[in-house]
Amino acid sequence: MAQIPPSLQDMVNRFNQAQAQLQSVLLRKQQYEAELKEVDKAISEIEKLSPDAKIFKNVGNFLVPQTRDAALQELKERKELLELHVKTLSRQETMLREQLDKLRDEINKELARLKGGEAAKGGG
Protein backbone atom coordinates (compact mmCIF):
# COMPACT_ATOMS: atom_id res chain seq x y z
CA MET A 1 0.00 0.00 0.00
CA ALA A 2 1.66 3.20 -1.16
CA GLN A 3 -0.73 5.67 0.46
CA ILE A 4 -3.46 5.43 3.10
CA PRO A 5 -6.81 6.65 1.77
CA PRO A 6 -8.25 9.65 3.66
CA SER A 7 -11.31 7.64 4.73
CA LEU A 8 -9.10 5.00 6.38
CA GLN A 9 -6.90 7.65 7.99
CA ASP A 10 -10.05 9.28 9.39
CA MET A 11 -11.18 5.94 10.87
CA VAL A 12 -7.74 5.41 12.44
CA ASN A 13 -7.82 8.94 13.90
CA ARG A 14 -11.28 8.36 15.38
CA PHE A 15 -10.08 5.03 16.79
CA ASN A 16 -7.08 6.69 18.44
CA GLN A 17 -9.28 9.45 19.90
CA ALA A 18 -11.74 6.92 21.30
CA GLN A 19 -8.86 4.93 22.77
CA ALA A 20 -7.49 8.04 24.50
CA GLN A 21 -10.97 8.85 25.84
CA LEU A 22 -11.31 5.32 27.17
CA GLN A 23 -7.98 5.57 29.00
CA SER A 24 -9.10 8.86 30.57
CA VAL A 25 -12.45 7.37 31.62
CA LEU A 26 -10.75 4.30 33.11
CA LEU A 27 -8.31 6.45 35.09
CA ARG A 28 -11.07 8.67 36.51
CA LYS A 29 -13.20 5.63 37.32
CA GLN A 30 -10.28 4.01 39.14
CA GLN A 31 -9.72 7.20 41.17
CA TYR A 32 -13.39 7.41 42.15
CA GLU A 33 -13.45 3.73 43.10
CA ALA A 34 -10.39 4.20 45.31
CA GLU A 35 -12.00 7.17 47.05
CA LEU A 36 -15.23 5.19 47.41
CA LYS A 37 -13.31 2.45 49.24
CA GLU A 38 -11.86 5.06 51.61
CA VAL A 39 -15.29 6.56 52.26
CA ASP A 40 -16.78 3.10 52.93
CA LYS A 41 -13.99 2.38 55.39
CA ALA A 42 -14.52 5.72 57.15
CA ILE A 43 -18.28 5.12 57.39
CA SER A 44 -17.66 1.67 58.83
CA GLU A 45 -15.26 3.01 61.45
CA ILE A 46 -17.43 5.98 62.45
CA GLU A 47 -20.52 3.77 62.80
CA LYS A 48 -18.63 1.80 65.46
CA LEU A 49 -18.21 4.93 67.59
CA SER A 50 -20.62 6.05 70.28
CA PRO A 51 -22.95 8.93 69.30
CA ASP A 52 -21.11 11.33 71.63
CA ALA A 53 -17.62 10.43 70.36
CA LYS A 54 -15.38 13.33 69.35
CA ILE A 55 -14.72 13.44 65.65
CA PHE A 56 -12.58 15.95 63.82
CA LYS A 57 -12.76 16.92 60.19
CA ASN A 58 -9.71 18.07 58.26
CA VAL A 59 -10.41 21.50 56.73
CA GLY A 60 -7.30 22.84 55.04
CA ASN A 61 -4.63 23.01 57.74
CA PHE A 62 -7.13 22.80 60.58
CA LEU A 63 -9.02 20.07 62.42
CA VAL A 64 -12.60 21.10 63.08
CA PRO A 65 -14.85 19.25 65.55
CA GLN A 66 -17.89 17.54 64.06
CA THR A 67 -20.65 15.38 65.48
CA ARG A 68 -20.73 11.69 64.63
CA ASP A 69 -24.08 12.07 62.87
CA ALA A 70 -22.89 15.05 60.81
CA ALA A 71 -19.76 13.16 59.79
CA LEU A 72 -21.80 10.11 58.78
CA GLN A 73 -24.28 12.22 56.84
CA GLU A 74 -21.48 13.98 54.96
CA LEU A 75 -19.71 10.71 54.17
CA LYS A 76 -22.92 9.04 52.99
CA GLU A 77 -23.63 11.98 50.68
CA ARG A 78 -20.09 11.76 49.32
CA LYS A 79 -20.51 8.00 48.84
CA GLU A 80 -23.73 8.56 46.89
CA LEU A 81 -22.01 11.11 44.65
CA LEU A 82 -19.02 8.82 44.07
CA GLU A 83 -21.29 5.89 43.20
CA LEU A 84 -23.08 8.10 40.68
CA HIS A 85 -19.75 9.11 39.11
CA VAL A 86 -18.62 5.47 38.90
CA LYS A 87 -21.94 4.44 37.33
CA THR A 88 -21.72 7.25 34.76
CA LEU A 89 -18.12 6.42 33.91
CA SER A 90 -19.01 2.72 33.58
CA ARG A 91 -21.66 3.63 31.01
CA GLN A 92 -19.13 5.80 29.14
CA GLU A 93 -16.63 2.94 29.28
CA THR A 94 -19.16 0.54 27.75
CA MET A 95 -20.07 2.99 24.99
CA LEU A 96 -16.42 3.68 24.17
CA ARG A 97 -15.57 -0.02 24.08
CA GLU A 98 -18.47 -0.61 21.67
CA GLN A 99 -17.32 2.33 19.55
CA LEU A 100 -13.76 0.95 19.48
CA ASP A 101 -14.99 -2.51 18.46
CA LYS A 102 -17.06 -1.01 15.66
CA LEU A 103 -14.18 1.17 14.43
CA ARG A 104 -11.75 -1.78 14.63
CA ASP A 105 -14.11 -3.83 12.45
CA GLU A 106 -14.49 -0.97 9.96
CA ILE A 107 -10.72 -0.48 9.76
CA ASN A 108 -10.11 -4.21 9.26
CA LYS A 109 -12.77 -4.39 6.53
CA GLU A 110 -11.28 -1.38 4.77
CA LEU A 111 -7.77 -2.86 5.02
CA ALA A 112 -9.00 -6.18 3.62
CA ARG A 113 -10.80 -4.36 0.82
CA LEU A 114 -7.70 -2.34 -0.02
CA LYS A 115 -5.46 -5.39 0.13
CA GLY A 116 -7.80 -7.34 -2.14
CA GLY A 117 -8.18 -4.52 -4.63
CA GLU A 118 -4.55 -3.41 -4.56
CA ALA A 119 -3.53 -5.30 -7.68
CA ALA A 120 -6.58 -4.16 -9.64
CA LYS A 121 -6.22 -0.52 -8.55
CA GLY A 122 -2.49 -0.36 -8.91
CA GLY A 123 -1.88 0.31 -5.20
CA GLY A 124 -4.30 3.06 -4.34
Swiss-Prot record:
Keywords, ordered alphabetically: Chaperone, Cytoplasm
An example Gene Ontology biological process: chaperone-mediated protein complex assembly
Source domain of life: Archaea
A Pfam family that the UniProt record links to this protein: Prefoldin_2
Coiled coil spans: none
Subunit structure, interactors included: Heterohexamer of two alpha and four beta subunits.
Family: Belongs to the prefoldin subunit beta family.
Protein name: Prefoldin subunit beta
Gene behind the chain: pfdB
